[in-house]
């Protein structure tokens, strides 16, 4: 990555991008609670909290990125097709997002 590309990335409005992504994901990604893990907390001597993203419709957090990207594409971009290289959670997220679009 060239220095100009790094500077451009640093100047982006990440807060606005996050708000837009959250808007796109409304009604898609499930809200998962943060839950304590007494067993892991006892084992480590520290409070351990878990976010069970395995409860998402695709079984992982990957639905968030895949859905957000596909939802951001124009009709022209969609017409060219969607390709992913994954045999796992990302592929499931892409397939789900493409079907829902």
Residue ranges and their predicted role:
Residues 1-101:
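PLP-dependent amino-acid enzyme catalytic core
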């Amino acid at each position: 990555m060239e220095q100009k590309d790094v500077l451009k990335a640093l100047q982006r409005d990440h807060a606005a991008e996050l708000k837009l992504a959250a808007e796109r994901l409304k009604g898609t990604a499930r809200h998962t609670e943060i839950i304590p893990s007494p067993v892991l907390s006892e084992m480590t001597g520290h409070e351990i909290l878990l976010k069970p993203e395995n409860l998402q419709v695709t079984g992982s957090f990957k639905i968030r990125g895949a859905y957000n990207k596909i939802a951001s594409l124009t009709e022209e971009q969609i017409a060219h097709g969607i390709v992913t290289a994954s045999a796992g959670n990302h592929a499931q997220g892409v397939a789900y997002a493409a079907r829902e679009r």
